[in-house]
Curated annotation (Swiss-Prot):
Disruption phenotype: Morpholino knockdown of the protein leads to death at 6 days post-fertilization (dpf) due to heart growth defects and absence of blood circulation, despite the presence of a beating heart. Show reduced heart contractility from 30 hours post-fertilization (hpf), onwards. Display defects in sarcomere organization from 33 hpf, onwards. Show altered expression of key genes necessary for sarcomere formation. One of its GO terms (biological process) is positive regulation of skeletal muscle fiber differentiation. Residues 11-88 form the RRM domain. This is RNA-binding protein 24. Multifunctional RNA-binding protein involved in the regulation of pre-mRNA splicing, mRNA stability and mRNA translation important for cell fate decision and differentiation. Plays a major role in pre-mRNA alternative splicing regulation. Mediates preferentially muscle-specific exon inclusion in numerous mRNAs important for striated cardiac and skeletal muscle cell differentiation. Binds to intronic splicing enhancer (ISE) composed of stretches of GU-rich motifs localized in flanking intron of exon that will be included by alternative splicing. The RRM domain is necessary for mRNA stability and mRNA translation regulation. It comes from the Eukaryota. The lineage of its organism: Eukaryota, Metazoa, Chordata, Craniata, Vertebrata. GO terms for molecular function: mRNA 3'-UTR AU-rich region binding; mRNA 3'-UTR binding; mRNA CDS binding; pre-mRNA intronic binding; RNA binding; sequence-specific mRNA binding. It is found in: Nucleus; Cytoplasm. Keywords: Cytoplasm, Differentiation, mRNA processing, mRNA splicing, Nucleus, RNA-binding, Translation regulation. One of its GO terms (cellular component) is cytosol.
Amino acid sequence: MHTTQKDTTYTKIFVGGLPYHTTDSSLRKYFEVFGEIEEAVVITDRQTGKSRGYGFVTMADRSAADRACKDPNPIIDGRKANVNLAYLGAKPRVMQPGFTFGVPQIHPAFIQRPYGIPTHYVYPQAFMQPSVVIPHIQPTATSATASSPYIDYTGAAYAQYASAATAAAAAAYEQYPYAASPAATGYVAAAGYGYAMQQPLATAAPGSAAAAAAAFGQYQPQQLQAERMQ
């Protein structure tokens, strides 16, 4: 004689989240308030004999199982359990209000693009280095040509060079018998243009100006006039 197995799809309940000290009797005691119980079993560990944290309860009818599953706060042996029909599995845990979980924000530049297109990485402002600005140092008049490879073509520098050139020209033309044109000594270059150039060579020795002046002194005016008259 073959016995037909009873359909327990809507009467067998899965109970999860049980403490280690929960037994079959304590599990049955909790579900008795919902109706008649056919079976209550706690799954235990074979070596230790303690509860593995879940069990199964089979109610006599479907209405009793529905009442047990609708309990909003099932507390078994001091711990809230997860009660649901066995064929549905454990209920998904509901987030309790008042708790927020922060998700780290991902910068849009670090999201990988499809089809193998390379991603342009954008670095935060904190990692960007500022542009290097070289401060301009105004050279002094005495050390402009000796310490800096760039000649300062400002008005002050031209005034210095113009005065020195005027003095040297006056010393040279004093020994020449013919008067020089005023335009030659009164010319001063316009200032305002500046550009970088190589380090200028050392100025001519003072002896060269003296040698040129001596050569003009030895050439007599009479000889010049005689040559012009020929």
